Amino acid sequence: MPDHPISAERLLTLAQVAELLTLDVDDVLALLHEGRLRGTRLGTAAQWRIEQSSVGDYVDDQIEETRRMHLWHQSN
């Protein structure tokens, strides 16, 4: 169980995350399965809901990865 309660305001649908990240829904689903995004299946239809903070963490990770790649290319 997470250390913090998850409120409905902090949960996003697959489509919302796909739009925010300019990805296909299938790509967002893959990120969930890879553990790069945090989410859960809710409701009787068991639809995915993704933690908003997880999206921010993913973006931060992508920025850091880009920064490191840039530094690596500069050093070569």
Locate predicted features.
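Short, intrinsically disordered low-complexity segments
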Residues: 9, 35-40, 48, 66-67, ...
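Polyanion-binding surface elements
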Residues: 2-31, 61
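A short, Lys/Arg-enriched interface patch at domain edges and termini
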Residues: 53-76
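Intrinsically disordered, low-complexity regions enriched for glutamine and histidine
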Residues: 2, 22, 45, 50, ...
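Structural detector for helix-capping/boundary residues
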Residues: 15, 35, 52-53
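Major-groove DNA-recognition helix of helix-turn-helix-type DNA-binding domains
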Residues: 21-49
